[in-house]
């Protein structure tokens, strides 16, 4: 099957676009009870635009949204208690809107998934794994570099939607300095401040990618620590010493940075083919949001 013949699945890392809408849209946008609704409005605009953009020549669009059910609970916390401990809790005004965003997905006819144990990344990883085996080409919609590790098929893409930056496997390697299948290794070495994942002191993304160009995985590095000092970059002996001193953290950090592809989660069993909105649900959610006629008409005629 050629890339033109393959159906393409668009898997959305929803939280990023909800947070972006929260910061981008005026907070005087409110629902029927006077509560902030700016994130829902922004997210709905994003979904509308995406559906319009991703329709194939046949009119078909395969879309799914993955949500983080909790900002604090994750199986990764069982591995490392301080995982994401640096993040402040979401404001109550935003937490309320996450529920609205999921309701909006259902009203818009978009499959939505979540888990109390696994993160949206793992849901996307599992969906990508399943759908790729079913013959789909995969596009991951996210600004999170972690998810670039899922660009494994020759027709797969990682799409930073807001910046309109779409990368295939070669593009990922050019931008991040490692192959998609090495992204987790790079982050395990360098750490990830956003998620509060520790790394080897003194090793950033550039140096991590250089080491991984010689030793392909964290496991290979651990078997060849004594060879690092022979590499041709300034301070190689010092880097070897640091890796040797902190090697005990690497198996843990590799687990933290690796996306799960066999996660269990809740969501619709139906095909992710977008088959149009549910008009009754659309009217219901827009009533809750106290939306005007213009927004309703736009969705009713999509």
What are these regions (language model features)?
Residues 6, 55-64, 166-302:
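Non-catalytic nucleic-acid-binding/docking modules located in mid-to-C-terminal regions
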Residues 3-138, 147-157, 161-166, 250-252, ...:
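Noncatalytic, basic helical substrate-engagement surface that gates or grips nucleic-acid strands
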